[in-house]
């Protein structure tokens, strides 16, 4: 299989992402550079948005082919983050980590205190890529999923993060 054929294969096939205990199926819709995606946030969210994706990497827009549950972490403080938001991750990507380690891995502006489940329906389009290191927030390196500015998902099962 040559490069063009393998690219077509992944665009048209259901891929299984296996990062430990969770497996979910999706279809790749489009691939962007991190720089293109970071510019989208500046153009569509706010001009001083910190670049969330690591420069020099690729960001994929995917379509979930089955209902999938992610998690979201937040601090629930005034001027902080809340239960409802645009960024999620796989549960096993934070399993066993302290709140400070989660903040560092996902370059969060505040140390999270809570976690909730976020159920996204089949057919939902989201983006996935590597977290950028951000001064004062964290070194990044985790795999993050963003909801592309959509107000979607069922946010439920709020609970304290272990270590709080």
List PLM regions with ranges.
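Catalytic toxin/effector domains delivered as secreted proteins or via bacterial secretion systems
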Residues: 3, 8-164
